[in-house]
Amino acid sequence: MAPRKFFVGGNWKMNGDKKSLGELIHTLNGAKLSADTEVVCGAPSIYLDFARQKLDAKIGVAAQNCYKVPKGAFTGEISPAMIKDIGAAWVILGHSERRHVFGESDELIGQKVAHALAEGLGVIACIGEKLDEREAGITEKVVFEQTKAIADNVKDWSKVVLAYEPVWAIGTGKTATPQQAQEVHEKLRGWLKSHVSDAVAQSTRIIYGGSVTGGNCKELASQHDVDGFLVGGASLKPEFVDIINAKH
C-alpha cells in the first residue's frame, strides 16, 4: 500500500482582507514547499475566488463550510456546486466552531459530508472533544460518535481527510502532546479498521489540529499516525511554510 501523503490544511477562519491575504499568498507562492506534502488553504467564502485565482495551482483551496443541497432558499449558505464553480476542490466540514458556536449537529454534518462528496469535493471532516469531555474520560466515546456520523455518509474514502481537533487545544495555546495526539489518532485508525475496512484505515489520512506552530510541528509530524495538520492562526503567518515542511 502506498504511504499516506502528508496533508497540511490552513484554516484562515474569519480573518484577512485582500491586502493581507494577497501578501500571504505571495509568500506561499514564492516558498519552497515539499513536493511530498499536499497543501490546501481554507479561505473565507467571499475570498475563495480571489484565493483560487492568486494561489499557485499546486496549492489547493477549501471552503470553510457548505450546505447539504445544491441550491435553493438558504440565505447566507453556499453549495458544493458553487465551490467547484470557482475552481476550489475542498471543503472543511464539522469544525468545532461550526459545532459549538453555530450549533451544527452530528446529523447535519453527516448530511453535508454526503452531499459534498456526491458533488465531487474533497472533505476535511473534523472531530474532537471538549475539555470537560477529556477530563471526564470520554474522549473516545465522543470522537467515535462524531466519526460514525461522518462514516455513515461516506462511500468512497479516497476524498476524505479526517481532522482530529481537541477543542480545548484550538486557539488556546494548549497543544495536545505528540503522545496524546498519537494515542487518539491510533484509536481512530483502529475504529476505521473495525467499522469500515482495513484498507480504508491504512489509506485515510488523519491529521491533527489544535495550536500547531512552527515550534511544535516537527515532533507532532514524527508520530506514526499523524498524517498532517489543520492549522489555524499559524496558517496566516510565514511560519505556515515551516509547518508544511515539517516532515522534511
Curated annotation (Swiss-Prot):
SUPFAM superfamilies in alphabetical order: Triosephosphate isomerase (TIM) (SSF51351)
Effect of residue 95 to N: Reduces activity 5000-fold
Keyword terms: Cytoplasm, Gluconeogenesis, Glycolysis, Isomerase, Lyase
Entry EC number(s): 5.3.1.1, 4.2.3.3
Signal peptide start-end: none
Pathway membership: Carbohydrate degradation; glycolysis; D-glyceraldehyde 3-phosphate from glycerone phosphate: step 1/1; Carbohydrate biosynthesis; gluconeogenesis
Subcellular location: Cytoplasm
Residues that span the membrane, as ranges: none
Record's catalysed reaction(s): dihydroxyacetone phosphate = methylglyoxal + phosphate; D-glyceraldehyde 3-phosphate = dihydroxyacetone phosphate
Residues the record lists as binding substrate: 11, 13
Outcome reported for the amino acid change (mutating residue 165 to D): Reduces activity 300-fold
Pfam families: TIM
Biological process according to GO: canonical glycolysis; gluconeogenesis; glyceraldehyde-3-phosphate biosynthetic process; glycerol catabolic process; glycolytic process; methylglyoxal biosynthetic process
UniProt-recorded Gene Ontology molecular function terms: methylglyoxal synthase activity; protein homodimerization activity; triose-phosphate isomerase activity; ubiquitin protein ligase binding
Catalytic residues identified in the record: 95 (electrophile), 165 (proton acceptor)
GO cellular component: cytosol
NCBIfam families reported for this sequence: tim
Function in brief: Triosephosphate isomerase is an extremely efficient metabolic enzyme that catalyzes the interconversion between dihydroxyacetone phosphate (DHAP) and D-glyceraldehyde-3-phosphate (G3P) in glycolysis and gluconeogenesis.
Family: Belongs to the triosephosphate isomerase family.
Quaternary structure, from the entry: Homodimer.
Protein name listed in UniProt: Triosephosphate isomerase
Gene responsible for this protein: TPI1
